[in-house]
Regions:
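Preference for solvent-exposed, low-hydrophobicity sequence contexts
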Residues: 1-8, 12, 16, 20, ...
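Structured beta-strand/turn binding interfaces of compact recognition modules in eukaryotic regulators
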Residues: 3-5, 46-49, 56-58, 62-65, ...
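Nucleotide-state-sensitive switch-loop elements of NTP-binding domains
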Residues: 35-38, 42-121, 128
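Beta-strand elements of modular eukaryotic interaction domains
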Residues: 30-34, 49-51, 139, 335-336
Length: 464
């Protein structure tokens, strides 16, 4: 397990370590040809803010067979011989937004690795190592069967090192400290890297010869994937707006123009609420089952076991949009053991006339059709990811680039003033021109959950 504070170089070290663990293996065939292959390496990415092989907001388990020679935005998803084994849509950029769910996702991915893989495993942790983040980190040391811990940064903080040394000693795991190697070149900020990874993900245009191909056209020029949410061809079971309960009549506005996770549930929707003793065994027994869409039963965790409310879990707005109802004025994420992430999408629009979602996603339409034919339930999960402002302004940036190119060819300066920007903004659904900007009024309000993390046992499931 590789851990350390932000900016310590954990991702770079994991990249180099994975490449070093991919020794070439000669395989002799009857014809005498000896092609070069690689022993696979497991990679558990627990950094939702800057993941290596997925867009921000995902926690994933991968099997690597190819060397990684580029930054994350060059491979926003696993391709070629690399394979994503299982992923969860965390919906946030830091574990601090839901520490319990983060911990349970990590345990689920690790248990999946133990059941299916025998290769070495590299675990890349988040850079949040202070306060509750340190508690989560030490719990991971106790909860995972580690053979070694690498802490990047020999400068501390001292309380972090002391807690890690104690946890490693109790778990009989060696702890190694390495000095961070700072780059002499200027680096992009974390927000810039997230934007580049997200942009790269949504501009993917398939894989050719084991390499990702991209479409450089603005997303506004791409045809969306039209998915019904009502009727006999309904492909989206419901939407989930994580966090505090929202007024359902605003759900279409909350979805349009934002990034959502596409979650697949392997049974009826089981949400991440309060668990009782023995409920984990029940979930393990039910894992892997796929129930038909007609059985919309709601299994909520209560202190006396699994309960089924009469109202059911799925309600509909006035415009017919199905949504998972809140529990205790809050919408909890799905149980990791009974769900997985398919990827992400940008909701281009909600057509309440045809009862369809218009999605921009690199996921092939054949994948949705296959899941629908096998009666798999698909949910759209709205979390707290960055707003894709870059997608709103791509057409404007393209126009400016063409104008500069024409100026270079003709040598004449073109007039491009505020009126031209206003005309462009009038045609955009989520963009407007603000005179002088607004200081702080447009900033999203983020709420931290699970502040009483240590007050509950590690095996307990719950959110505060």
């Amino acid at each position: 397990m590789v851990c350390g504070p932000k900016g310590a170089g954990k991702s770079t070290f994991c990249r180099m370590l994975a490449n070093a663990l991919l020794p070439k293996v000669s395989k002799t065939h009857q014809d005498g040809v000896q092609p070069q292959g690689y022993d696979p390496v497991g990679f558990l990415d627990l950094d939702p803010g800057q993941p290596e092989f997925s867009p921000p907001g995902e926690l994933s388990l991968l099997k690597l067979k190819m060397c990684n020679l580029g930054p994350p935005f060059t491979h926003p998803t696993a391709c070629g011989d690399n394979e994503t084994i299982k992923a969860h849509h965390f919906g946030c950029l830091s574990p601090k937004d839901n520490t319990h769910y983060y911990y349970q996702c990590a345990l689920d991915l690790y248990s999946h690795y133990r059941r299916t893989a025998t290769s070495p495993l590299i675990i890349n942790c988040s850079g949040w190592v202070q306060g509750s983040g340190l508690e989560v980190l030490t719990d991971l040391v106790h909860g995972l069967c580690l053979t070694g811990i690498i802490y990047l940064s020999t400068t501390g903080p001292q309380e972090v090192l002391g807690a890690l040394e104690g946890a490693a000693s109790r778990s009989n795991v060696p702890l190694h400290q390495l000095t961070s190697q700072l780059s002499e070149f200027p680096t992009r900020t974390a927000a810039d890297q997230r934007m580049m990874s997200t942009l790269s993900y949504f501009h993917m245009h398939g894989v050719e010869g084991g390499n990702i191909r991209w479409n450089a056209s603005p997303l506004t020029n791409m045809a969306p994937l039209v998915v019904p949410y009502e009727g006999p061809k309904q492909a989206i079971l419901a939407i989930m707006v994580l966090g505090d309960e929202q007024n359902p009549e605003f759900y279409d506005s909350l979805l349009e123009g934002c990034v959502v996770g596409i979650a697949v549930i392997q049974q009826d929707p089981v949400v991440f609420g309060r668990s009782s003793k023995g409920s984990d065994d029940k979930m393990t027994a039910m894992e892997g089952q796929i129930l038909p869409k007609q059985g919309h039963l709601f299994q909520a965790f209560e202190q006396d076991g699994l309960q089924t409310p009469e109202s059911g879990p799925i309600l509909r707005t006035a415009s017919g949009i199905p949504y998972l109802r809140a529990q205790g004025h809050s919408v909890h994420p799905l149980l990791p053991a009974s769900s997985y992430s398919l990827g992400q999408a940008i909701v281009r629009g909600v057509d309440t006339t045809t009862k369809t979602f218009h999605l921009l996603t690199p996921i092939p339409s054949e994948t949705f059709q296959s899941l629908h034919q096998h009666n798999c339930n698909i949910l759209l999960v709205r979390g707290r990811l960055d707003t894709p402002i870059w997608a709103y302004t791509e057409q404007l940036a393209l126009g400016k680039g063409r104008r500069l190119r024409r100026e270079g060819e003709t040598g004449e300066k073109e007039v491009y003033g505020p009126d031209d920007v206003d005309k462009w903004a009038e045609k955009q659904p989520w963009a407007s021109v603000v005179e002088g900007g607004r200081s702080g009024s447009g900033k999203a309000r983020r709420i931290r959950r699970d502040l009483r993390y240590r007050s509950q046992g590690r095996g307990d499931v719950g959110s505060v």
